[in-house]
Amino acid sequence: PAIMLIFMGLVLALIPVHAMHEVREVGLPPHVILEIFLPVMLFWETRNTSWREARTRLRGILLSGTVLVIFTAFVIAWVLHTFMGVYLWHVALIIGVALAPTDAVAVATLNGKLPKSSITTLKAEALINDGTTLVLFALALQVAGGHELALGTASGMFFFSFLIGSLVGLAVGWGANKLRAHIGNPMNFNVFVFTVPFIAFFLSEEIEPFEGMKGSGVVAVVVAAFYLTYRGPDTIKPQNRFYGLPIWSFVTYVMNGALFVLVGVQLPSAVEHMDGVVHEYNYAWALALAVIVVAWLVSIAARFIFLHVTIDIIRALDRSEKQKQLRTTFRGRVVSTFAGLRGGVSLAVALSVPTDVPARDFIIFIVAGVVLLSMVVQGMLLPLVIRWAKIPVDTTEEDEINEAVRTIIAESFDSVAEIGQEIGAPQWIIDRIADEQMYNASMYRNLHAVRKHGANAPEEARRIIEASDLEKELRLRHLEKQRSVLKRLRNERTIDTNVLHAIQEILDIEEARVLGPVELE
């Protein structure tokens, strides 16, 4: 998908039609890239991150989300500056900063390939490292502007960015949670929720108690999203949740794809201006391509070294039983290294470099090349690395879902009769709902047995699941027949198009109930 999207941008930029001449200049002001794309993308990815798992592995996540980013940025910059001829330090540093963070959206593509605990760790790391990256980016731009990089200033920027961002995120999350509880219309609800990440982001960025020491919008968005996600079951009405999730999934998918398209659109211009950059700074094209490969390899090596050394230090200092349960093998570290994909965030940082920064086109070219290598080569190697590591199949989430459903059905079963009598429902309705609950409990119990034991599951359980599959097929084909009748009525002009849409929605909801939840990531 990454290659296809960048190729689409290239096609748009190269269309030789006079009416499309302005497409070559398609783009957004650099500072707008981060302000538009990051808040929404991070808000959605935070919603899909397990807070429980993140708390369990908080120490490693914080180290990877802060120290590893700083380490990677400066190692890449040092290698490019010292050995690869990128003799402008600020250019090497900006490239290092852009390539330092892993990407939460890219990590989401690994669902089903890695254990849920690993996915959660990678997602949480990616969310935190975005905040670290933007602070480093601000420092790198100061260096590009001729300022010296002072340790005290850098430390203050990190401290206040995370402190102010966390406080603003909590405040915005608390206020938004109170307000959304009173919004009943799904459209109004989703419009309101879409404003939350922007409010958190811009409010935090505007708070600057000391010069240069402002809050992190990224941290504010992540904290607000975590708070709202945790309080969601208490304040989100079911219809708002039902209609909202597909919208969020679609918008974030389009936004992430748009970053790749924007890079593709700007590549011809970047390559055109690269001639001047190459000549002015003595970069040869072969060297520019070599810089891409070396920067990618260094990003992988830096991640592996940091993870290896950090884990060994933690093991030496913490020998508690809890820590022993979280330990990973050497092969597991290799998998974590290759799973650190670069993606949309790196592109957003590169596109956000101000136009007056020397060698901006070179920076975009290098970062786009490394992201492509990461997405394509790393992405292709990762399944092989996972198989080599022999990571066992993780059924933890599936087991928890089945256990939770069984517990919910069991503990709520008696309430059917109580509530029915309380509201005066006829006995036959109470009995029908009770029978449905018993049937659902039986189905979940047998489904869990078949998924867990496979061919070794009890014969009765396998027989019931086979019958359930036939029932699902029957219901789906019956719905298909109903839709054909509905279309015939529309074609015969017996019903209006609006009537067709209304009945279609009823049939679609029924089919969604039969098929069950769909993975949106």
Where are the regions that the model predicts?
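Transmembrane helical cores of multi-pass secondary ion antiporters/exchangers
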Residues: 1-400, 486-506, 510-521
